[in-house]
Amino acid sequence: MPNQKVKEMNKKTKALIKTLTTDNVAVIHSTFEDKPRTVAFIAMDKSMSVDEKLERAFMLTNTIGDAWYTSDQVNYIGPEKSCRSTAVGDFVLVGKTKYECVEAGWSEV
């Protein structure tokens, strides 16, 4: 029984550390949709800059070799079995601030 309590405590400690050290960034597709849809959450290290988080979110939600939504680095929550890549006009939510993907980078909304 003591081993079970230790395992449970370790599990809770790991979850707490993850919560304290990571941000969940939301990717919202709206360019070609009739209304904006959150399609993915990506866990990012809190020490990353906003620009680094935006660029990583863009990179991880674009298909280069394998379909991006099958990656274990992305929590895909889209309504379809497949999903297009993130494009100009889509959004990324970092904390409480939304950024629009523009032709050359990002613009705070």
Q: How should these model regions be labeled?
A:
Residues 1-11, 108-109:
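Short intrinsically disordered terminal tails
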Residues 82-109:
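Short, compact, well-ordered microdomains
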Residues 70-82:
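Short alpha-helix capping/helix-loop boundary micro-motifs
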Residues 6-73:
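N-terminal non-globular leader segments, chiefly Sec-dependent signal peptides
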Residues 2-4, 36, 79:
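Proline-rich intrinsically disordered, low-complexity coils
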